[in-house]
Amino acid sequence: MAGAGLIGIRRRIKSVTNIRKITKAMGLVSTAKLRKARVNLEINKKYYNEYKIILKDIINFIEDSNIYIDGNGSHKKLYVIFTSDSGLCGSFNINIINNVINEIKEDKENSLVIVIGQKGRMYLKKLGINTLAEYIEIPDVPTTKEAGTIAKNIIKLYSSKEVGEVFLVYSEFYSPVKQQVLINKILPFTKENKSDNKYIEFNPPVTQLMDEILENYLKATILNCFSNSKASENGSRMTAMNGATDNANDLLDNLDLQFNRLRQSAITQEISEIVGGAEAQR
């Protein structure tokens, strides 16, 4: 009996040891990717924040009617969801999906979805939520190429009045252990009252530049979401894998203890049988 128990524990120790090797390796890879993602995030954040200030000034000085400010009359809402292509990143993806579900459940008929990432596509398919477009296999360091493709699709849907409001749903990165799901409205723009005496002269007129300004702003905004999402994903995966490695270490300690106790018991029993046999032969 003891022999069978020892064999079973040995198998479990081998299995947990192999799993620990995988989780430790994935944790190290995620740490390296997170470091790279954070550098990329800081660079993109500076560009995005500067462009946001410029756009705010431009929007406030446009006096003519413009669908990107006044709206286009459509009641449809578009949600662009940023998820990951890979799993094993804790609650990163499910938190985003839950926020989207809570947002659209009151008005499903007027809610449309574009999903980024294999995991988001999989979750939405299980929930029976149809998508307008799907973007997968996004590189670890997203570029303006990926952002531009999505930006052009958003502009096309909005300018053709297929959607009247556009929201980006993504995970804002604060630290490896703290991320927050945000739902950011990007269209139509919100015009603020002029609070200073700033005067801006445009040549050519800003109305002629609006399409280009809009596309560049959406690229910057989407790239910022990508950068936050990648940092959040790798931070969540690093935390999850480090936690799994710690749990594997604890489990191995317990299994080693069980193994040693069982082996000691088997040795004691064997000695007792030998002594008992010797006594019987006297």
Swiss-Prot record:
One GO term in the molecular function aspect is: ATP binding
Q: Sorted alphabetically, which keywords does the UniProt record give? A: ATP synthesis, Cell membrane, CF(1), Hydrogen ion transport, Ion transport, Membrane, Transport
Name its cellular compartments. Cell membrane
Q: Does the keyword DNA-binding apply?
A: no
**Coiled-coil features, chain-numbered ranges:** none
Which membrane topology term applies here? Peripheral membrane protein
Q: Please indicate which superkingdom the organism of origin belongs to.
A: Bacteria
Gene Ontology cellular-component terms for this entry are: plasma membrane; proton-transporting ATP synthase complex
Q: Looking at the keywords, is Glycoprotein present?
A: no
Q: Which Pfam families match?
A: ATP-synt (PF00231)
Q: Which GO terms describe its biological process?
A: proton motive force-driven ATP synthesis; proton motive force-driven plasma membrane ATP synthesis
> Record's InterPro entries?
ATP_synth_F1_ATPase_gsu, ATP_synth_F1_gsu, ATP_synth_F1_gsu_CS
The UniProt entry's sequence similarity note says: Belongs to the ATPase gamma chain family.
Q: What does this protein do?
A: Produces ATP from ADP in the presence of a proton gradient across the membrane. The gamma chain is believed to be important in regulating ATPase activity and the flow of protons through the CF(0) complex.
Query: Subunit composition?
Result: F-type ATPases have 2 components, CF(1) - the catalytic core - and CF(0) - the membrane proton channel. CF(1) has five subunits: alpha(3), beta(3), gamma(1), delta(1), epsilon(1). CF(0) has three main subunits: a, b and c.
- What this protein is called in its record is ATP synthase gamma chain
Native source organism of the sequence: Clostridium botulinum (strain Hall / ATCC 3502 / NCTC 13319 / Type A)
Gene assigned in the entry:
atpG
